[in-house]
Amino acid sequence: MNDVFLKALPVLQKLTTAGFEAYFVGGSVRDYLLNRTISDVDIATSAFPEEVKEIFQTSYDTGIAHGTVTVRENNEFYEVTTFRTEGTYEDFRRPSEVTFIRSLEEDLKRRDFTMNAIAMDEHFALHDPFSGQLAIQNKEIKAVGKASERFHEDALRMMRAVRFLSQLDFELDKETEKALESQIELLQHTSVERMTVEWIKMMKGKAAKRAIELLLKVKMETYLPGLKDEKPALSEFASWDWEKRTTEESIWLGLVVAVKPNNVNAFLKAWKLPNKTIQLVNKAYQDALKMKETWLTDELYHAGKAVFSLVNELNVIRGQENNQHKLSQAYEALPIHSKKDLAITGADLLKWSGESAGPWVKETLDKVECGVLSNEINNEKIQIKRWLGYHEE
């Protein structure tokens, strides 16, 4: 049995010893059945939150309104959630009310897909009322109950379906795909932040190309930031070899290269990306657009390692030769990597000249920077001083 389950097993045992039901549920059980890496486990129980807190010495109310208590066991923290049913969904994400119950099957009934509605008890026996194992065997993403109801409860589940297709290389069953297509407009009620997370996970999957093809088939791009009417660009984007991707930034650089938005900054901001990512992708955009492979010395210098590495990564994704080693060698061979590496400062110029500060200081440092980069002069203080025409004291 997987070590992650074995380590968490005492949590289940404490709950069952106290007279309650307790199970591993959700993604960890699915991934166990698929022989995928399991990072953490979710635990569901018939014990109500206050009952859970009585059983464990250390606990935290991390989501008690929805039945979740975090408990500590063997110096590890585990989320334990009470079986529950949910009322109507008023904002296509959150239920209007949550009712704690004692029935495992009723709890599993509210979950999104059958492969995520399998429970495992303390003896590692599986409880699978919705045939999730069969769906996994058939490599099928199938909604629990009516797909239209599951998507109406939380519209993000539509993106999750496409993401799982990419990650697992599965297919959507006919009813689920039909509901996805007919209810796709519900996605407009989903926050950008949540969609961005799903987009990144989708692009990291092994079947990203098929996922994008499905996304376009159901017109999901209409509700994604900056992608309305961009079907041709996304088709091109999907054709690249994304299994060669090594960074998240390459996903965003590839997207702007394919879409060519008028304002790259605004396009990326619409996805609520970190400023650091936006700045890097923005800086790399023009070089990536040109599919630059050969870099002059000053181009390498002004781009910096992060930019030329990102451009090279996208070039590889688009089928070009990997020049990373050659570019890195050329970059490391540069005499300086930023103006801060110069052997002189503005203070030196003021001291040598005896003049007041002014624009001339920056202009002179720029001149020295160019001279050092072109190997016209060595980056040594005395040589630079002579080169500028100042006499030695």
Curated annotation (Swiss-Prot):
ATP binds at residues 27, 30, 111, 154, 157, 160, 163. Signal peptide: none annotated. GO terms for biological process: RNA repair; tRNA 3'-terminal CCA addition. Its EC number is 2.7.7.72. Its cofactor is Mg(2+). CTP binds at residues 27, 30, 111, 154, 157, 160, 163. The keyword Nucleotide-binding applies. Mg(2+) binds at residues 40, 42. Belongs to the tRNA nucleotidyltransferase/poly(A) polymerase family. Bacterial CCA-adding enzyme type 3 subfamily. A single active site specifically recognizes both ATP and CTP and is responsible for their addition. Homodimer. This is CCA-adding enzyme. It comes from Listeria monocytogenes serotype 4a (strain HCC23). The lineage of its organism: Bacteria, Bacillati, Bacillota, Bacilli, Bacillales.
